[in-house]
């Protein structure tokens, strides 16, 4: 069975997790998969910038988790790559805003209700709460090292 929810992680910052997430997401989408890339690096989000979508962020992951926005409202469709969508992290909230059980529900909804074939989760660096939350719904992991 292939992993449908994959966390892209590392023990330290600056190794290329975000770049790997964006590029793998684009490659899978170009192969015909419907892909959601989810930025869980609350407070230090960058996946939207790497993908060129920073000007289109209205709602984010924390808005969804805290009930201020529906999941579909927060998803941003990449106009350059068909079948590629971004769920951005919050730029202002603290990592404590992430609840692992609620995040599992968001990933489940992406796969089961929104029909995504694959969810790639861009994890914050380290082994603290943010990275643990990012890994909670994952069925597989891609560990980026340098």
Spans of features found by a protein language model:
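Walker A/P-loop phosphate-binding motif and the immediately C-terminal alpha-helix
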Residues: 2-41
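P-loop/Walker-type NTP enzyme "switch/lid" segment
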Residues: 40-117
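Glycine-rich phosphate-binding loop used to anchor ATP phosphates in small-molecule kinases
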Residues: 115-130
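Flexible glycine-/small-residue-rich
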Residues: 10, 39, 88-91, 123, ...
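Hydrophobic anchor at the start of a short beta-strand
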Residues: 34-35, 119, 141
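Inter-motif core of Ras-like GTPase G domains
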Residues: 128-146
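A conditional alpha-helix N-cap/helix-loop micro-motif detector
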Residues: 18, 99-100, 124
């Amino acid at each position: 069975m292939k992993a449908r929810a994959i966390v892209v992680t590392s023990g330290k910052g600056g190794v290329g997790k975000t770049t790997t997430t964006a590029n793998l997401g684009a490659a899978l989408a170009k192969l015909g998969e419907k892909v959601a890339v989810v930025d869980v690096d609350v407070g230090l989000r960058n996946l939207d910038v790497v993908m060129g979508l920073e000007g289109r962020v209205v709602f984010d992951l924390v808005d969804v988790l805290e009930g201020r926005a529906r999941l579909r409202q927060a998803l941003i469709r990449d106009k350059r790559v068909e079948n590629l969508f971004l769920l951005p992290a919050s730029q202002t909230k603290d990592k404590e805003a992430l609840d692992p059980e609620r995040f599992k529900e968001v990933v489940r909804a992406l796969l089961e209700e929104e029909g995504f074939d694959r969810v790639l989760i861009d994890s914050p660096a380290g082994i603290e709460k943010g990275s643990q939350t990012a890994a909670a719904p994952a069925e597989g992991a891609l560990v980026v090292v340098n």
